[in-house]
Amino acid sequence: MLGVSATTIRTDLNQMDKAKLLTKTHGGAGYRDASSGNKELTGRAYFFHERALENQHEKDLIAGEAIKLVENHMCIFLDASSTAYTLGMKLRGFTELTVITNGINLALSLKDIPGVTVILTGGIVTSASSSIEGLLGEDLLKKIHTDIAFVSARGFSLENGLTDFSIYEADLKRMCIKSSAKTVALIDHTKFDTTSISSYASVDDIHLLITDNGLSRNTKEIYEKAGIDLLIAGE
C-alpha cells in the first residue's frame, strides 16, 4: 500500500487543484499543460480506443495465454482494461460461461455471444475509460463467487503490488479479488516497477501474473525470487 488513506489522497488532490498544479477529474486528476492538453498524470485520460491501440502485440500474447485458463461453466471477472478486452474477444466458442465486468465496451461486445452471460457491476459510468466505477454494486459482488479474476493495472511493483490511478476503480477491483478463487494479473512489461495512486492487490493476492516477452531477464529473476508466479507469453 502507499501508506496513506483515500481521504488523505483526496485532500492532497484538492489542494493541488486549487494551486492549479492539476485538474481534478472523477476518480483522478489531470496534468495542466497548455502544450499537450489536459492529460491525467498516468495517462488515464486517454479514451479506451486510444489505449486499445497501445502495445497491441503484447496484449494479444498475454490474452492468448490467459484464455487457456478459461473453461466452460466458469464465472470470471474481467476488468475494464484494454488487455482484458483483448482476452474477452477470445471468448467466442464457449457454450456456458458467465462474465462479470465493469467494462462497458467489453459488455457490449460479449452480449451477442450465445454461450456467454454478461453481468455488469453497478456504479458510475466514466466517459474516457468507458468503465463503471464505485461500489454501488457492492452487495452484488459480495454474493457472487468467481473462479478467476483477470485484472490489469497502471503499475506493478513488489512494494505496492497492483496499482491504479482511479481510487474508485481500485475499490471495485479489490472487492472482486476478495470474492474470487484465483487472481490472474495481465501486465505487460512496461508496467513493471511503476506505481500509481491506489493499491488494490498485494503480491500475495496474485496467483499468477502473465506478461509478455519484453520483460528483461533481470526483472524476471527479481520478481520470481520474490515468489511471483510469472508466465511469459511469447517465449
Please give the residue ranges for each predicted region:
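HTH-adjacent hinge/linker in prokaryotic transcriptional regulators
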Residues: M1-G3, T7-T8, L13-F77, M89, ...
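Conserved phosphate- and dinucleotide-binding cores of soluble alpha/beta proteins
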Residues: G3-S5, K18, K24, A107-E235
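Short, flexible active-site-adjacent loop segments at beta-strand->alpha-helix junctions, enriched
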Residues: S35, S82, G103, I124, ...
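Residues at secondary-structure transition points
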Residues: L53-H57, L61, S82, F94, ...
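Structural motif
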Residues: D79, I100-N102, T121, L186
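Short glycine/serine/threonine-rich phosphate/pyrophosphate-binding segments
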Residues: A84-L87, T194-T195
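A residue-level structural signature of the nucleotidyltransferase/glycosyltransferase Rossmann-like core
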Residues: T98-V99, I148
